[in-house]
């Protein structure tokens, strides 16, 4: 059983005797053969072959015994099992270093003969460096004999035949699959053609159907568009009234917000000042707290020292008390001794008569005893004085300790009170900070509301500007209509006087074809021209001024946003400004005002947007006066409660 470990083309350097070096590539194959008959052993087979030369064959069989001798000869450090992998690593390093200019590892094939024919060769793995060429491994390979070459060629032929068989089989499989795929492709192409024809007919029917549905949907969409336009006009009127109300509310809200903003800013400044004061107080209280803590630490240290001194004094007092107890015991013993001596003295006095001989001796002894008693009494007095002094010192120390304890207790109480005050101040400062934050949030919210209201105000102002531009355009259109009418009336100046008077009274010539609705291309909406009579009733001073200054010119639309109260002019003669003709107009056949057909109420009329707040308020104040003053000479009309946007006397469409 053989296991191929390595089989690749390896570049090497070929050196023959008396020949130049040449580079070439040789296929190196390494196999591990394991034999079990008669003894289990493993052999390493190294074979060199050349793909271009089939007779180039060198073999080397290394058994475990051969490897041991090789290991001893060349000083190898690996065992037989690890040797193949190390040899493969060296070959791979030679392959990697081959492309470099100065390769570090080289594979050399050395021959002692002039040609590589039947002579053994040496395969060396050389490591090059600037100092020396080191040979890591040198293997002696023997050329193959005829039998080995024939076996090798037979094996190569067998491998090539097997490869050919496998390739022919794969070719047959591929051709079979190709035929199958071609057949399926033709079937799929036929199905695709059928599907295309079906799809074309289906798409044609669908396009016809969808075109019919699309026309029906277009008609429905046109109907819905008309309905939506009508709804839009109604919503537009409602939105204009709502817009005016919103402007009133926003202006009042703006004034309230400004007042609230002022109050909040004042409160903020007051809060800032209180916060500064509280911070200053807090800093002072913290300094006092630090001082008190330092005093407490110093007092605690003194207390510790006094405690140690007190313990030492107590120890000293205990020692003195023990000494006093010893002395008292001695005094008691001596008192007993004195009592005994007294008893002996009594017995001696009693026995004095009998013992007169020993009287002198007893008197001497008695004198000695009295001297000892005196000395003992003096010592007792001294000991009593020492005890009294120690008791006095102990009382003074205890008094000092009591004083220091009382002082420390008072200091701790003061510290606790100051800490409570500090906590209260901190709570107050936190509450003030939270109040300030809430106020700041409220101020930000109010500022945002103020910005939105200001933005809405600016939008309404922009709308007013657009409406003023529209008014100027209306004036221009009216002037152009008046000029056209003037040119037409110049051609018909020969008509009877009665017809001119009737046309003057009615406001415009009946022959003039005045368009009911003026189309404004800039707005995209057709606006109706309101009645001149209602305009004169609403703004009598404007019409009178225009008639006196420009008697020839036609009716113009003017707006005075700051209107005076027209009660006097309206109550006086409501129809005077309408029916008063000018002398120059009589001569030229011109009329001042519009025809009676334009004074009728239009159901489809749309009021203009964006009237200013002052004009609306004035129109509301003048509503009752205008209703009383607006009367036609032939047919009285009933006015509704609401007025038009640009002509306060015109009726809006309901």
Swiss-Prot record:
Key words, A-Z: Cell cycle, Coiled coil, Cytoplasm, Cytoskeleton, Phosphoprotein, Ubl conjugation
Single GO biological process annotation from the record: positive regulation of spindle assembly
Cell location: Cytoplasm, Cytoskeleton, Microtubule organizing center, Centrosome; Cytoplasm, Cytoskeleton, Microtubule organizing center, Centrosome, Centriole
GO annotations of cellular component type: centriole; centrosome; cytoplasm; deuterosome; procentriole replication complex
Residue ranges of every copy of the PISA domain listed in the record: 39-91
InterPro entries for the chain: SAS-6_N, SAS-6_N_sf, SAS6_CC
Entry-annotated residues carrying Phosphoserine: 509, 612, 654
Coiled coil, from the record: 175-471
Predominant location category: cytoplasm
Chain spans, region Disordered: 568-589, 634-654
Biased composition (Low complexity): 634-644
Superkingdom classification of source: Eukaryota
Entry PTM: Ubiquitinated by the SCF(FBXW5) E3 ubiquitin-protein ligase complex during S phase, leading to its degradation and preventing centriole reduplication. Ubiquitinated by the anaphase promoting complex/cyclosome (APC/C) E3 ubiquitin-protein ligase complex, leading to its degradation and preventing centriole reduplication.
Matches recorded under Pfam families: SAS-6_N, Sas6_CC
Role summary: Central scaffolding component of the centrioles ensuring their 9-fold symmetry. Required for centrosome biogenesis and duplication. Required both for mother-centriole-dependent centriole duplication and deuterosome-dependent centriole amplification in multiciliated cells. Not required for centriole formation in embryonic stem cells but necessary to maintain centriole architecture. Required for the recruitment of STIL to the procentriole and for STIL-mediated centriole amplification.
Assembly and binders: Nine homodimers form a cartwheel structure with an internal diameter of 23 nm and radial spokes connecting to the microtubule triplets. Forms a complex with CPAP and STIL. Interacts with FBXW5. Interacts with NUP62 and TUBG1 at the centrosome. Interacts with CENATAC; the interaction increases with CENATAC acetylation. Interacts with FZR1; the interaction is regulated by CENATAC and leads to SASS6 proteasomal degradation.
Free-text note on domains in this protein's UniProt record: The 35 nM long coiled-coil domain mediates homodimerization while the globular N-terminus links the dimers at an angle of 40 degrees to form the inner ring.
Protein name stated in the entry: Spindle assembly abnormal protein 6 homolog
